[in-house]
Amino acid sequence: MRYRRFGSIVLTGALAIAALGTAPAAVAGPVAAENPSAATVANGSRHRVEVFAEDGSIGRATVPAASPYLTGDRPGLAPAAGDGEVTPILRSGDSAGKVDVVVIGDGYTAAEQEKFHADAAAKWQELSAVEPYAGYRNLFNVWAVATVSAESGITGDPDRATVRSTALGSYFWCEDIERLLCVDTKAVENYAVKAPQADLVLVVANTAKYGGAGYNVASPLGYDGIATVAGGNPKAGQIAVHETGHSLGKLADEYFYDGSDTYPAGEGEPAEPNISMYTADRLTHDRAKWYRWIGRTSPDGGVVGSYEGGGYYPKGLYRPTENSIMRSLGREFNLPGREAMIAGFYRHAVPLTSPTPAGTPLTRSDRLTVDLPVAGTTLGWSLDGRTLPQLRGRTTVDLRTVPLPGPRGRVHTLTATATDPTPAVLDPALRTGLTATLSWPVTR
């Protein structure tokens, strides 16, 4: 479903956290030019997380990696029936060619597993309703991993005195921040590994109370970051959208802290594609970062240019637009953000697959089928490097119709090439990831 837009006022720094009911000491100060999706706080027992207010504003805090309320995975106890079971919510193809999203529940008892699956599916629908997800759904597999908790609900709901026994130890009032929904990250990893693959991880808590968190962790399983959300709250899905901006798009946060220092120029140009030390004129002159989008109307409102403030600093860094989802929830990705997200999809997924594995020997009596998961993808065929214009756009080819010159027994190479021609990706370096080829030997 689509969300109503939140107010455009952005609370920053301590004000944003204060809106959630917190002790100011929990607020982390600016960190220069880091990639939050891959960052882990220096002391391994704590993680840097993002905190999301109901008004759409975003702040940061550091929290324990372990939950004091964890009751799952206890030595000597057999897991409950159904615990760890994996169910596909959406299966578009083999994991080798897809983005795999893993949705893990917490606070759902054995009798509530049907509710968990409904909540998990709803959160995926909320995430995939946002562009560019909406146009690329078929690049994704979504897996629900069940946990069976001893008690229903989440610690801290409805009040901080409430304690629940749950598999992942999810809890509100983390670091004295009421709406900050923390989790035991090792327990999450122990369940994520049960899925075929984990590129994104979303923890859905059995609560209607608004809250969540965005964890900046890099797992050896391959996922960057964990998003926690309230399964019964229709606004919490936006937390997952923002977090995937980091993990898939490698985007920086575009919000900043009032009263913070100016970004130190000695740190150099940030690596992320959506913040820069330079104004629009300089980016255009240098043909750098989002210069190709400058002057265009952006889906998050306004025109792409250079707006001072971003990467946690109010001065010294610029963002492409006034207020995208990387600055506050309830917004759209801006044009440079959409470009980065699509490129991120294709770092994990491919625009061309086939039920017949590439390299499988074929003969003239075979029929070959390929799949194009994204609408509008162009498809071409070639034989031994020579284009076959008569086959352009065909997803099924009867090899008897393919001219195979030479003597009987000669082996030819048939190649399919697919390209996503989307105008949402302008950078030639990123566009290379939007093309894929598959080849098969064909014997005359």
Q: For each predicted feature, which ranges?
A:
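Secretory targeting and sorting signals
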Residues: 1-28
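Propeptide-to-catalytic entry region of secreted or membrane-anchored zinc metalloproteases
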Residues: 34-191, 421-424
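Solvent-exposed loop/turn segments at secondary-structure junctions
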Residues: 106-111, 148-152, 207-211, 234-236, ...
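Short pre-active-site segment immediately N-terminal to the catalytic Zn-binding motif
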Residues: 115-116, 219-243
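Catalytic zinc-binding patch centered on the HExxH motif and its immediate surroundings
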Residues: 153-154, 189-198, 204-226
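Catalytic Zn2+-binding segment of zinc metalloproteases
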Residues: 244-260
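Surface-exposed, short loops/turns at beta-strand junctions within beta-sandwich domains
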Residues: 401-411
